[in-house]
Structure formats: C-alpha cells, structure tokens
Amino acid sequence: MSKANASAERIKDTISSVSNLVKVDSEEDAEIRGKGYVVFDDVSFSYEGTTRAISNISFVLERGKTLGIIGGTGSGKSTIINLMMRFYDTDKGRIYIDGKDIRSYDLPELRKHFGVVFQNDFIFHDTISSNIKIGRDISDEEMKKAAENAMASSFIEKYEDGYQHQAAIH
C-alpha cells in the first residue's frame, strides 16, 4: 500500500509541475510532422532538490532506428523519457524533435506521439482490442495500426477471434 501511495504522490507532483513548463515563443505552434528525428543536445537535468539525474547527454535518434538506453536503478533512463514527453524541462541543453525545440510544441500534440511501455506488464481482463485502445476513443483501423507499429499484429491475427481474443497473462 505504501508503494501505491508513493506512486500516487509522484503522479500528483508530476501533473502539478506541468504548469511550470516554459513554452518557446514561435510564430505558430509547431506541429509534429512524423519525421521522427530526435536530438538530445548536451542535456542535463536535476529533480528539485536532488543531485543531477543526467549530465551532458547527447544523442541523435533517426526514424526507424533503435536506441538502447541501459543502466542501473537511478541512472536516468526514465528521466530521458520524462524530458522527451515534457513532464519536465531541461536544466541545460536542448531537445529537438524534427528540428524544432520541443518547447515549441503544444503539450497534447507532443504527447500524442508517444507510447509508453511500463517495466511491469499489466493486461486488463478484456479483449486484445480493448487493451490496445485502453480507454481511448480510436477506430479499429487506428488500433490495428498501433498493433502493427508494435509488431504485435502477426501473433494477434493468429488467434481465431483475432483482436477480440480475451487477453490473459499465463
């Protein structure tokens, strides 16, 4: 129960911190065009009142390429994702998506391009389709495209009832 309380407190803190984010002035809100080009340029970040979570991180991630980020607990892996999704702003350096500073993107526009896979797997006792949609109002076509992008469609379609198959962890 204490883990759940701690997690709830972190979520509350994260949500309330969003209002402190700085938006870069631009002629118009930048729109992500789906090129998928991400650049971390000398990025450093510290959570409030703590030592540096990451220091001077630089990398380029091109569309269709994979970047493996490994490290022990507390090494900054989740921090990199939190910064890309703008739960926080960097202390130093910049993050660019498709050549534009991520601070120029509207938060909902930015975040709709991310999918997060948690370290602990969890499946709702429901259909595969419902687990992919997870409460979002999207079409079956969009849901199937998400499965294709996650390279899951081939095994899902092997089930006789496909996306309507009851999901379960064995």
Task: Describe the residue ranges of each PLM region.
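A generic local structural motif
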Residues: A8, V24-S26, D101-S104
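Pre-NBD coupling/linker segments of ABC/ABC-like ATPases
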Residues: N20-R33
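ABC-type nucleotide-binding domain
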Residues: S16, E31-H170
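Cytosolic ends of transmembrane helices, especially the final helix of ABC transmembrane type-1 domains
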Residues: M1-T14
